[in-house]
UniProtKB/Swiss-Prot annotation:
Gene: pckG
Amino-acid positions noted as binding GTP in the UniProt annotation, renumbered to this chain: 276-281, 402, 433, 530-533
NCBIfam families the UniProt entry points to: PRK04210.1 (NF003253)
Organism field: Ralstonia pickettii (strain 12J)
Obligatory cofactor(s): Mn(2+)
Function text: Catalyzes the conversion of oxaloacetate (OAA) to phosphoenolpyruvate (PEP), the rate-limiting step in the metabolic pathway that produces glucose from lactate and other precursors derived from the citric acid cycle.
Signal peptide as annotated in the record: none
Name this polypeptide is given: Phosphoenolpyruvate carboxykinase [GTP]
Catalytic activity: oxaloacetate + GTP = phosphoenolpyruvate + GDP + CO2
Length: 622
């Protein structure tokens, strides 16, 4: 299946175990366009990982950390211009503009392909093209899908080995004609003969482009995270959400956790929170003192793929997998206090990006310890001391600094996390960061009301001053930056999934809305959060089991004070009233803001949602 050298394109060097002619032809086409110096087919082995890491250390891209402190771990420092996802350079190039909808950037596919062809022509000159085969989800799972990323970044190759099931076994699943999502990535910095490379190559021009109908992803100019690790947001959410729309399943920006009661019964919950709302902390929650015998296990911390199928009793249920195999988490704010399990996961085999380096060869970031070290090398490679930070306000770690760590290292990992069949979902949770208005926890009375809650959820983008509401950014289902098609059609898809389940006689998962972030009149958080969120989770399970009555109000059903377990926590009925109360005037203003969202998404908006809003207004008495 090999091809001769032609037009300056290197030999493809196809390994014997790759038996997929369409894949080989595609690699040849991309190589002819991008003109790399050589092609390497990644096999996912430890030897390959170690070799690529050693090459990056030699190139100055990464530093090996002190093995006595962090075994087999590395620190990469990016270019200061390449530190986060670039939403304004992210495009959904569907055939029709209305299929992308008003919340996505759209360009006509033919026009975009012309632009990309110009950018990618010769873009890998002087570099190695890595062929990175990966499975999103356990190999061979009926819920999983396969992708192949062609990238000129060794940083991408090693991160994809941690974040996905990457390597030779993927070709066994693909066989000779299996489907795969083609992903092409370049840092966009070709090297002339003899030109010295920089430690973190990238290009000021950036494009992250998705073609939903052909299930293709093209990324130019960035070496960072979600822009370059194309299995993550690009495939697992943007492309997969369109696959789910077409095939009747869900690709969601959700953690998945297991909860086991003292009696030994296990439940599974999927929860969607926008960034900076504690998703990873909730996924790795440790129950507090007073809730002995309860256990929380982690299946995933970021993405869930959910497909309906029959269980052993012939009942249709929604089954979920974590399509990833690692955690790509935000480091700042993570500590043994806020997330003990995450810190335990980070002891070895980790790639850190844009955190600070300690004098003894370990890592540090803001929030890791109460007192920072006396001296650090910051994320830009400069000396940093607490005094210089005070003077200049400079952070030691970039606020979006990341860790890439294998999921299997998490102490709270669920024994079923790698089960190809997935786990059955008993409840969905949606939540944002709101200092006022939204109660601690509310259960939707039915699926449509739950979809309404999720469609209108939001988070404050600015710290709210006392008595003043922050600017609320609507982030429907926490999917605003990640939905690969028209958001109004996405709402309709959720309603349809619920209808189909109901028609099959299934018991639908309950839907809850939470808000851990209510503040008092002094601007202080009222609810303690973190492990104490288990008390709310326990009430949800009591509701699933029909053991808690709750109290119905305008917006759904919330717990009575006595229905939550307060053992080990001093939290008064007055404090509880502050986090659970509903202010009618605030809700009238809130519903007016929901109107703004619905006006923006009017094209294709399911009538069920304005109808649900009308019912809420009637209950409010106005």
């Amino acid at each position: 299946m090999n091809q001769p050298v032609m037009q300056g394109v290197p030999a493809l060097n196809v390994p014997d175990y790759v038996k997929h002619p369409r894949l080989v032809a595609w690699v040849g086409e991309v190589a002819a366009l991008t003109k790399p110096e050589r092609i390497v087919w990644c096999d996912g082995s430890q030897e390959e990982y170690d070799r690529l890491c050693a090459e990056m250390v030699a190139a100055g891209t990464m530093k090996q950390l002190n093995p006595a402190k962090r075994k087999n771990s590395y620190l990469a420092l990016s270019d200061p211009s390449d530190v986060a996802r670039v939403e304004d350079r992210t495009f959904i190039c569907s055939q029709k503009k209305e299929d992308a909808g008003p919340t996505n950037n759209w360009t006509a596919p033919a026009e975009m392909r012309q632009t990309l062809n110009g950018l990618f022509d010769g873009s890998m000159r002087g570099r190695t093209l890595y062929v990175v085969p990966f499975s999103m989800g356990p190999l061979g799972s009926p819920i999983a899908h396969i992708g192949v990323e062609l990238s000129d970044s060794p940083y991408v190759a090693v991160n994809m080995r941690i974040m996905t099931r990457m390597g030779r076994a993927v070709y066994d699943v693909l066989g000779t004609d299996g489907d795969f999502v083609p992903c092409v990535h370049t840092v966009g910095k070709p090297l002339a003969a003899g030109e010295k490379d920089v430690p973190w190559p990238c290009n000021p021009t950036k494009y992250i482009v998705h073609f939903p109908e052909t299930r293709e992803i093209w990324s130019f100019g960035s070496g960072y995270g979600g822009n370059a690790l194309l299995g993550k947001k690009c495939f697992a959410l943007r492309i997969a959400s369109t696959m789910g729309r077409d095939q009747g399943w869900l690709a969601e920006h959700m953690l998945i956790l297991g909860v086991t009661s003292p009696e030994g019964k296990t439940y599974h919950v999927a929860a969607a929170f926008p960034s900076a709302c504690g998703k990873t902390n909730f996924a790795m929650l440790i129950p507090p003192a007073g809730l002995n015998g309860w256990k929380v296990t982690t299946i995933g911390d970021d993405i869930a793929w959910i497909k309906p199928r029959q269980d052993a009793n012939g009942k249709t249920r929604l089954y979920a997998i974590n399509p990833e195999a690692g955690y790509f988490g935000v480091a700042p704010g993570t500590s043994e206090k806020t997330n003990f399990n995450a810190m335990a996961t980070l002891k070895e085999n980790v790639i850190f990006t844009n955190v600070a380096l300690t004098d003894d060869g370990d890592v540090w970031w803001e929030g890791m310890t109460d007192t920072p070290p006396a001296h650090l090398i910051d994320w830009q490679g400069q000396d940093w001391t607490p005094a210089s930070a005070k003077e200049t306000g400079r952070k030691a770690a970039h606020p979006n600094a990341r860790f890439t760590a294998p999921a299997a290292q998490c102490p709270s990992i669920d024994p079923e996390w790698d089960n190809p069949a997935g786990v059955p979902i008993d409840a969905f949770i949606f939540g944002g960061r709101r200092s006022t208005t939204v109660p601690l926890v509310t259960e939707a009375r039915d699926w449509t009301e739950g979809v309404y809650m999720a469609a209108t959820m939001g988070s404050e983008t600015t710290a709210a001053a006392a008595g003043q509401q922050g600017v609320v950014r609507r982030d429907p289902f926490a999917m605003l930056p990640f939905c690969g098609y028209n958001m109004a059609d996405y709402f309709a898809h959720w309603l349809k999934v619920g209808e189909k389940l109901a028609d099959s006689g299934a018991t639908l998962p309950k839907i809850f809305c939470v808000n851990w972030f209510r503040k008092d009149e002094n601007g202080k958080f009222v609810w303690p959060g973190f492990g104490e969120n288990m008390r709310v989770l326990k009430w949800m399970i009591d509701r699933i089991e029909g053991q808690a009555q709750g109290e119905e109000h305008v917006f759904g059903v919330s717990p009575r004070y006595e229905e939550l377990s307060w053992d080990g926590l001093d939290f008064t009925a007055e404090q509880f009233a502050k986090v659970i109360s509903l202010d009618a005037d605030a809700w009238k203003q809130e519903l007016a803001l929901h109107d703004e969202l619905f006006t923006k998404l009017a094209h294709g908006l399911p009538q069920a949602l304005p109808d649900a809003k009308t019912r809420l207004e009637e209950r409010l008495g106005g």
